[in-house]
Design a protein with these regions (language model features):
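Acidic, Ser/Thr-rich peripheral helices and adjacent loops at domain boundaries
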Residues: 449-454, 533-545, 627-637
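A cross-kingdom feature strongest in bacterial/archaeal respiratory oxidoreductases
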Residues: 2, 33, 50, 55, ...
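Long hydrophobic segments that form regular secondary structure
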Residues: 260-277, 282-292, 297-301, 312, ...
């Protein structure tokens, strides 16, 4: 038999030319593979499974466990198939045809089991353990070992969520290689030598990596286990359901394991085109928010005494319908960025059909009219599964150069960070970032900082476009962006910079680099597509275009749609606070997420009628007139559209028949029932109908919205004792979807303020001391970390423990704040109160 293989499928790569192929024989079967292919991979292509522990297709070869030994003709001894590459004319015999290879593998297995404990009945890995399986298939029937097994103290917590059992470890180095190579976090290593060798961490240096959970999943023997899952269940007790992560716009494929109606754990699924086999710890561990005891399970209605009390669904829907009908054309809808495509579409339709308004916006964050124009002209209707264009994970990894603007990959889209780091390791991709300082994520991706104070991004982008007025690193970046395949990545934070997105479009046109927008939340890309914006209808249709409105009205069975350009989130909040709007429908939005939380709370207190669709009690439900519980991601089917424009469908992991409690309906179902109660036909009773209607509308084929055309604002000029505020959210912060997992919370990065050395000296604060930052509404104090960054700029994590910047200070990035030592904090606070 002769087999010829070319490039791996799924990547869209051309076939390997014949001169780049080598031909070898494995167990009598001849095959041709690309040069550089490992023998163990070539055997897999023939369906031959060579036992292994250390080998992993996404890690560099190590040859640590020696379990994959094969016989190679012409070699003096058996060789590890995971480390040798195929050569022309090579003849390989595996354990299936070679007594030498079989004996060697049996011997290695016998040695591995000498000190391995008999923990299988209680080990979390039992039932899905490669060592257990291969001991049965490739081990001796009896052990010759009669001594006492080596023991260690166990388990050893190497972080709050990863526990180490050294007795079980076979020193495969999968965990250490992943941490070093893939995540760039060399926080665990193999220490000691010989018989004393073991996995360890530095003294007082815990394993605080955003990707530590991957080491648990790829450990082949249960030496690394999850603190939250340990001894909770056995693999054969679990039902596994494919799903998609709901935490960021990456769209990572996951596997949800559940038992008796309760999610027990979540694992990374294998998707070579998206997350490969990895996921961040937030996606892996942050699912318990839906299982907390305060979960809403019945509707609530505010009674005549002003107290929320439980109500039946008909009662709650009638109360909500009565209030919203009275406010028709004077109501706003805030949806947040976490909704599925179908749910976001339902809100978009509900706003126009039931409330007769375009006052709807998903952007519970800093936003602008310039961003709305950018999304309408450059994002809507474009992407991998929309029009077949756009940047993907694969093209981002292959790009010769990438510029990040208003985007921190490790904190805001960890899957993107892993691809950037992989690209730097494999082919020295050049990564540049317009930011205040070099973040850990940028350093781990081999990136170069282009130091930019808040507001100067527009000037930087124009300079990169023209190639004029740049210093060495800027000149190199401008040249790199002109290489074929280069990419400019803009994040949602660039919306805070006047002219920033306009300049990004100009830079893309001038350099030829492809432009891609990567938001932070999972539902934002889909919300753009279904018209959860004041300026857009579904399919990228401009809300002010008569033909666009006619198309949508025809599908929705209406005579006409509202023609007025709607209010954005900021304007909706202002209108609610001043009484211009008399009702709000709020879904999954926290005031703390908004640029001005205090004003948002005033609006919620002032608005005449408030309906909240939520999972758990929040600041919004506390103020709501009607609270309607909705389903969590694990409890419903749906679709996310990731930043690539790739459709990510998932089914419900938890089904009604598995539950001991009644599952809440989806947002779409609730809005359908609410519209019925308002005597309005929404026509979205289920997912299938909703999906079909979205497909029927399709993409807009008319003229697109105009490109953004915003100019830069005058930059603030801080005096002594002042600074321009900069900041972004950390991956693990005080977000409500992270609640319920104390082990995960224990790995949050400590919150610090950052200043340049000159600014710190001017402010009278030394490294490690408390720096106070005072805005228009209050003060926050954090330990100072002196950093190489522009002068008179202060960087703060925006929503970390000890530093809810917008809530505590009333300041937003780009604004002026006062800075000083802790001793001046009370004085500054008194001035604010005065």
């Amino acid at each position: 038999m002769t087999v010829t293989t070319s490039a791996p499928s799924g990547g869209g790569e051309a076939a390997v030319p014949p001169e780049d192929l080598v031909t070898l024989t494995i167990d009598g079967a001849e095959l041709s593979v690309p040069k550089g292919t490992l023998v163990i991979r070539a055997a897999e292509q023939l369906g031959i499974e060579i036992p292994r522990f250390c080998d992993h297709p996404l890690l560099d070869p190590a040859g640590a466990c020696r379990q994959c030994i094969v016989e190679v003709e012409g070699q003096r001894k058996p060789m590890a198939s995971c480390t040798i590459t195929c050569t022309d004319g090579m003849v390989v015999k595996t354990h299936l045809t070679s007594p030498v290879a079989e004996k060697a593998q049996h011997g290695v297995m016998e040695l591995l089991l000498i000190n391995h404990p008999l923990d299988c009945p209680v080990c979390d890995k039992g039932g899905e353990c490669p060592l257990q399986n291969q001991a049965m298939s490739h081990g001796n029937a009896e052990s010759r070992f009669e001594g006492r097994k080596r023991t260690y103290e166990k388990p050893v917590p190497i972080s709050t969520q990863v526990l180490l059992d050294r007795e079980r470890c076979v020193l495969c180095a999968r965990c250490t290689r992943f941490s070093n190579q893939v995540a760039g976090d060399p926080m665990i290593e193999l220490v000691e030598r010989g018989a004393l060798q073991q996995v360890g961490t530095g003294e007082g240096d815990p394993f605080e990596s955003y990707f530590s959970g991957n080491t648990i999943q790829i450990c082949p023997v249960g030496a690394l286990t999850s603190a939250a899952y340990r001894f909770r269940s056995r693999p054969f007790d679990l039902v596994s359901s494919p799903s998609v992560c709901e935490h960021c716009s990456g769209g990572c494929a996951t596997r949800t394991d559940h038992r008796r109606g309760k999610v027990m754990r979540r694992l990374a699924a294998d998707d070579p085109e998206v997350n490969e086999e990895w996921m961040c710890d937030k996606g892996r561990f942050a699912f318990r928010y839906a299982q907390l005891k305060d979960r809403l399970d019945v509707p609530l209605v505010r009674n005549a005494e002003g107290v929320l009390e439980a109500a039946s669904w008909p009662e709650a829907l009638e109360a909500a319908a009565r209030g919203l009908t009275a406010a028709r054309s004077r109501a706003g809808v805030l949806t947040g960025g976490r909704l599925t495509v179908e749910d976001a579409y339902a809100y978009s339709k509900f706003a126009r059909v039931a409330l007769d308004t375009n006052d709807i916006d998903f952007r519970a964050r800093v936003h602008s009219g310039e961003e709305a124009d950018f999304l309408a002209s450059r994002v809507a209707g474009r992407g991998r599964d929309l029009d077949g264009t756009g940047v993907t994970y694969t093209s981002l990894e292959k790009a010769p150069a990438v510029l990040l603007v208003g985007f921190e990959s490790e904190e805001e889209a960890p899957g993107v960070f892993l691809r950037l780091r992989k690209a730097w390791r494999k082919h020295k991709q050049r990564v540049y970032a317009l930011a205040t300082h070099a973040t850990r994520g940028l350093e781990k991706a081999g990136g170069t900082l282009l130091p930019a104070a808040p507001g100067t991004e527009t000037e930087w982008l124009d300079a990169l476009a023209s190639g004029v007025g740049l210093e060495d690193s800027g000149t190199a970046a401008a040249q790199a962006l002109r290489a074929e395949g280069a990419v400019i990545v803009v994040g949602e934070r660039l919306a805070a910079v006047a002219g920033g997105l306009t300049a990004a479009v100009r830079a893309s046109a001038a350099t030829g680099a492809r432009l891609v927008w990567i938001p932070r939340r999972a539902g934002e890309r889909g919300a753009v597509e279904v018209g959860a914006l004041p300026s857009l209808l579904p399919g990228g249709r401009p809300a002010t275009d008569p033909r666009a409105r006619e198309e949508v009205a025809a599908v929705w069975g209406l005579a006409e749609l509202p023609a007025r350009y709607g209010r954005d989130t900021h304007q909706i909040i202002e209108a609610a606070a001043t009484g211009e709007l008399s009702a709000l429908v709020v879904a999954g939005v926290e005031p703390a997420d908004l640029p001005d939380p205090a004003r948002a709370r005033e609006a919620l207190d002032s608005v005449g009628f408030l309906v909240s669709l939520e999972l758990r009690p929040s600041e919004v439900t506390e103020r709501a007139d009607v609270v309607l519980p909705v389903a969590a991601v694990a409890e419903k089917p749906g679709t996310f559209l990731n930043w690539e424009g790739r459709v990510r469908f998932f089914d419900a992991a938890l089904k009604p028949e598995q539950m001991t409690r009644r599952l809440a309906p989806t947002d779409t179902r609730v809005l359908h029932m609410l519209a019925d109660a308002m005597d309005v036909h929404l026509g979205l009773p289920d997912l299938r109908t909703t999906r079909a209607e979205i497909d029927r509308l399709g993409a807009w084929d008319g003229p697109r919205a105009s490109e953004p055309a915003e100019s830069a604002n005058a930059l603030p000029r801080p005096a002594a004792g002042e600074a321009v505020l900069a900041g972004h959210r950390l991956l693990l912060d005080q977000g409500v979807l992270q609640e319920g997992d104390e082990a995960l919370a224990g790995t949050r990065h400590a919150a610090h303020a950052r200043l340049s050395s000159a600014t710190a000296a001017e402010a009278g604060v030394a490294d490690g001391e408390i720096l106070t930052v005072t805005g228009p509404r209050g003060t926050v104090g954090l330990p100072l970390r002196i950093t190489d960054m522009p002068d008179r700029v202060v960087w703060l994590p925006l929503n970390s423990v000890g530093g809810g910047v917008a809530s505590d200070t009333g300041a937003t990035p780009g604004s002026l704040v006062r800075i000083g030592p802790a001793a001046r904090a009370e004085e500054a606070l008194e001035e604010v109160e005065a």
